[in-house]
């Protein structure tokens, strides 16, 4: 029994490491596109934060939801987004997740439970809380994860939604 558990852990660790490498590879390629002026708009890299997205998304199911930040590429990849559609989105192509209209800071893949990135600092917190409220009302066994950065801690919305989530016992994790 112990041997199989070790194998399972080794497989999980390898899967998570591979996912972290995939995110870094995506970010390196996206950065090159940006620096070569082939990508319209701005981009904010997620390099160095890969373990956060992978560790959290590894525990989620496809029906669980996430919301993201302006540095959302890693969250998207960790939740199962395809590179081709992500790069198409970054390049403004119709084949992108948002038909090329969202760009780097607004990628969403609802088929994988990714409700989208948000360029507004702390802007996805209300969306995540609303998604968790919806899950609770519908009796779904889903959780919503709201990724946010340190800048969001200066936004009043953060404290308002955390208070609401605690009072209403919503299935949301602020990470």
Where are these regions (language model features)?
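Short, compositionally biased low-complexity segments
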Residues: 1-5, 28, 62
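Charged, compositionally biased N-terminal leader segments and the immediate start
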Residues: 1-16
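N-proximal short alpha-helices
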Residues: 3, 25, 97-101
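Conserved acidic
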Residues: 12, 20, 41
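N-terminal glycine-rich anion-binding loops that anchor highly charged ligand groups
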Residues: 18-34
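Cofactor-binding active-site loop characterized by glycine-rich and histidine/acidic residues
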Residues: 31, 38-168
